[in-house]
C-alpha cells in the first residue's frame, strides 16, 4: 500500500513539472532603490501604479523588458508590493512597506508574468506582464 505522504509528494512533483517552477524575481528584475522614496521624486512619464482605496489602480499592467514600474501609495494605510513565484506561491520578492506618498520601483529584465499582492492586505492583487 502506498502511503499518503508518498502520494502527496508525487502529486507535488507532477504539478511542479507540469507548470514549471519559476526562479526568484530578483533574477528577473532590478531594484533601483531598496527603500521607498518620495512620490514627488517620480519622473514625468514614468510607468506608475497608484495604490488607493485599498487596491492597485491598474490591476494588470503590460510593459516591455527593461521598463521600470513604480508603485505609489496614495492613502494613509501602509501598503507594499509582494511578488510570488511558482505554483505554490512562494515569496520571490517582498517590497518595503510604503507610507502615504511614498513610492517603490522595479525594473523588469526578463519577460514573464509576475503576480503580486499587498502583504497585510492579501485581497489586494495585481499582475505585471512583461513582453
Curated annotation (Swiss-Prot):
The positions making up the signal sequence are: 1-26
Q: Does the record bear Electron transport in its keywords? A: yes
Q: Where is this gene product found?
A: Periplasm
Key words of the record: Copper, Electron transport, Metal-binding, Periplasm, Signal, Transport
**Cofactor info, note text:** Binds 1 copper ion per subunit.
Q: In which pathway does it act?
A: One-carbon metabolism; methylamine degradation
Q: What's this protein's name? A: Amicyanin
User: What is the organism field in this record?
Assistant: Paracoccus denitrificans
Gene that this polypeptide is encoded by? mauC
Amino acid at each position: 500500500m502506498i502511503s499518503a505522504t508518498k502520494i502527496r509528494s508525487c502529486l507535488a512533483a507532477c504539478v511542479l513539472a507540469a507548470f514549471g517552477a519559476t526562479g526568484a524575481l530578483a533574477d528577473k528584475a532590478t531594484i533601483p532603490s531598496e527603500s521607498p522614496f518620495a512620490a514627488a521624486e517620480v519622473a514625468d512619464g514614468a510607468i506608475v501604479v497608484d495604490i488607493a482605496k485599498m487596491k492597485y489602480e491598474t490591476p494588470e499592467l503590460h510593459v516591455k523588458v527593461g521598463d521600470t514600474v513604480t508603485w505609489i501609495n496614495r492613502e494613509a494605510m501602509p501598503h507594499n508590493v509582494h511578488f510570488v513565484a511558482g505554483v505554490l506561491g512562494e515569496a520571490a520578492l517582498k517590497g518595503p512597506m510604503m507610507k502615504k506618498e511614498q513610492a517603490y520601483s522595479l525594473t523588469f529584465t526578463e519577460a514573464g508574468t509576475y503576480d503580486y499582492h499587498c502583504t497585510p492586505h492579501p485581497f489586494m492583487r495585481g499582475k505585471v506582464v512583461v513582453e
